[in-house]
A protein has these predicted regions:
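Noncatalytic, beta-rich nucleic-acid-contacting surfaces in large DNA/RNA-processing enzymes
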Residues: 1-205
Length: 205
């Protein structure tokens, strides 16, 4: 909100030949958006659009990373395919009691829907290949990070990356032993997400 002009300022501006539109603006708004700022916004929008067209996987990987930092990317919801995404979008659109969190989730769902429509796919989360926090590009697909699993925080995600170094696990049990910060609940989340592939629960024969 503008705070107007201090006493005498308008008279001084008129005397100095300042245009009426500028004086009027000073009375109404606190900040005048400069042309250079507007140009910078346009250039940034052009860069983003260029990446979206010519390097789409890099664009989506960066976008999903930013959304995940705010808890706006849930791998359980986002990696289920086109029909699943559309069903979740419809559920929020038709919910008269949708919360601000739901609306924020809807934004991500719509971009993921576009992602699928363009023929792209997510690679399954992998205990060996997923990053703790970054979305990676792998074999023409996007590989979600560990934190994309709802309820699995950064501490556990980084512990997974550290614990797997130089390892060739024989079982899910071995993963658990190598990653002490990853709780049993987290391990079940990873298992449900398919992160362990064909690893058996234990190393016992």
């Amino acid at each position: 909100k503008g705070k107007g002009l201090p006493p005498g300022a308008e008279e001084e501006m008129v005397a100095a030949g300042v245009p009426d539109w500028y004086i009027g603006s000073c009375k109404k708004i606190k900040y005048l958006f400069p042309k250079a700022h507007a140009v910078a916004y346009c250039m940034m929008a052009f860069r983003i659009a260029w990446f979206k067209v010519y390097h789409p996987l890099a664009f989506y990987a960066a976008y999903f990373y930013r959304r995940s930092q705010k808890g706006g990317f849930d791998a359980g919801l986002m990696t289920g395919g086109l029909e699943s995404i559309l069903a979740n979008i419809d559920a929020i659109d038709n919910n008269a009691d949708a919360t601000a969190k739901d609306e924020d989730l809807l934004t991500t769902l719509e971009v993921v829907y576009e992602f699928y429509l363009r023929g792209f796919e997510f690679a399954p989360i992998s205990v060996y290949e997923s990053h703790a926090t970054k979305f990676l590009i792998k074999d023409g697909k996007i590989l979600p990070p560990f934190v994309a699993i709802s309820g699995l925080g950064e501490s556990a995600a980084w512990d997974l990356m550290e614990g797997r170094k130089g390892k060739n696990f024989l079982s899910i049990e071995e993963v658990s032993l190598a990653c002490p910060k990853v709780s049993k609940t987290h391990m079940q989340m990873l298992k449900d997400a398919g992160a362990f592939g064909s690893l058996p629960d234990t190393s016992q024969v």
